[in-house]
Amino acid sequence: MEIKIVRNVLEANNKLAAEIRQRTANSKTLLVNLMSSPGSGKTTLLEKLIPMLQAKGYQIGVIEGDITTTMDAERLQPLNIPIVQINTEPFGGDCHLGAELVLPALDSLDLANLDFVFIENVGNLVCPAEFDTGADVNVVVLSVTEGGDKPLKYPLMFRVCHLALISKTDLLPYLDLNLDLLRQNMLQINPKLTIFPISAQRGDGLADLRDWLIKLKR
């Protein structure tokens, strides 16, 4: 019975995810799901990346996921973009956003006038990988401070993602991290994974990321 319940939950989520994909396909909106551990730099990345997309004429929306607080959404307010906050605490404090939460959030956005919508998922390397949000692109952000073994310890996250961002590369001179080995570990789990080293603080790699997303949008 327990296995059946789990299967039913995932099946229900997948049906809603398919509905989300149909909706964003109709509006020609690229839905991007950002996943990572807490503190990997997702919000800082959005603070720097969104203006770069806006400078190219693209309209952006954000769905902010956290267990509690609106702190990350408040950081993005100066960008003058539509932001929908989802706090999971009222729903049991889930450590992920599922399609059942993303779908009503999309109802609050004018998708017809948005080119990109970024989901900033709840900080966790486990749960978010298990639930399809309906995103067109899954992105994992892994900071250099987390070590090179994370792809091997949390393989599902890297298996379900299309893109891996190795963040905070400006800290590499202060760390004992083998960047080539980290790449190898990522590709061992997912040989099709695209990998960009980035530093949101310095701007390194952000132009490549912007262009990669724009190419997908076209």
Language model feature labels by segment:
Residues 59-60, 137, 162, 194:
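Residues at the starts of beta-strands that form the adenosine-phosphate
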Residues 43:
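Walker A/P-loop
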